[in-house]
Amino acid sequence: MFKGSNVALITPFKNNELDVEAYIKLIHFQISNGTNGLVPAGTTGESPTLSHDEHQKVIDLCVKESNGKNIVIAGTGSNSTKEAISLTTHAEKAGADAALIVTPYYNKPTQEGLYQHYKAINDKCGIPIIIYNIPGRSVIDMSVDTMARLFELKNIVGVKDATGDLDRVNQQKDKMGTDFVQLTGNDDNALEFNNRGGVGSISVTANIAPKLCSDFQKASKIENNESKLEAIRLDKILQPIHSSMFIESNPSPVKYAAKLLGLCDDEVRLPLVKVTDPTKDIVKEALVSANLL
């Protein structure tokens, strides 16, 4: 279930309000282009600037519009355990298939604090939980040992690994086995991540290149030479897009790309701002190189 290409959905805005029409359009664009899973209200969805009502609404819309065609992995993380429980409980009631829960940011818990945070959510909720380990944003790195302890709990099923450290894939596989789901949060390392035992990605690029990302993920997990060569070919096409998505703060570049494709406006909420003209040129060039524009 939790494998292949899963999109870290952007949240479209119009005049600083949620653009429901554009959001529904984005969801169906993903459904029709082979995306396995939809991930609303994550980092790329600008969750830090969504109100609680908006956070719940984007999850509700995602579940409703996907209508069982795609899995929904709802972003429900917070640096407040109480709030994370509340958001996860809502996602469960809404019908989400799983929750993506980021390691608590800013308050810098110990490894025991991380364990107790996820255990408390696990004990109060009944849907699968995917740990989101992103030390670059959370300023805390969950250790493999802590992850292994959490995997013993009933609802913890895997990790979105955004450490950028490919050795972690091997370490986590050795410690937890192949039943522990490993999804990369770094588009640029997806090929090697899967080669080492990962099973997919939660992708920024998939917002604008869903079919390419889906085809790449499928090819990368088929054990024959022809498929491996196809995965390498698709990865080479995707790499310029991956690079262009992170020249400036995510999700500003991907929102500009989505605007070029007519999917939604490029509006972001402060403190994020729209991309500069030099970045626009690079994003546009990357889309053209992949025949997306």
UniProtKB/Swiss-Prot annotation:
Keyword annotations of the record: Amino-acid biosynthesis, Cytoplasm, Diaminopimelate biosynthesis, Lyase, Lysine biosynthesis, Schiff base
Catalytic center residues: Y132 (proton donor/acceptor), K160 (schiff-base intermediate with substrate)
Molecular function GO labels: 4-hydroxy-tetrahydrodipicolinate synthase activity
SUPFAM superfamilies for this protein: Aldolase
Biological pathway: Amino-acid biosynthesis; L-lysine biosynthesis via DAP pathway; (S)-tetrahydrodipicolinate from L-aspartate: step 3/4
Catalytic activity entry: L-aspartate 4-semialdehyde + pyruvate = (2S,4S)-4-hydroxy-2,3,4,5-tetrahydrodipicolinate + H2O + H(+)
GO cellular component: cytosol
Gene3D superfamilies registered for this protein in UniProt: Aldolase class I
Group of enzyme by EC: lyase
GO terms for biological process, alphabetical: diaminopimelate biosynthetic process; lysine biosynthetic process via diaminopimelate
Residues with site note (Part of a proton relay during catalysis): T43, Y106
Residues noted as binding pyruvate in the record, renumbered to the chain: T44, I202
UniProt KW Secreted keyword: no
Location in the cell: Cytoplasm
Keyword Amino-acid biosynthesis attached: yes
EC number: 4.3.3.7
One Pfam assignment: DHDPS
PROSITE patterns: DHDPS_1, DHDPS_2
Origin superkingdom: Bacteria
Family: Belongs to the DapA family.
Protein's job: Catalyzes the condensation of (S)-aspartate-beta-semialdehyde [(S)-ASA] and pyruvate to 4-hydroxy-tetrahydrodipicolinate (HTPA).
Subunit (UniProt): Homotetramer; dimer of dimers.
The protein's name: 4-hydroxy-tetrahydrodipicolinate synthase
Organism whose genome encodes this protein: Pelagibacter ubique (strain HTCC1062)
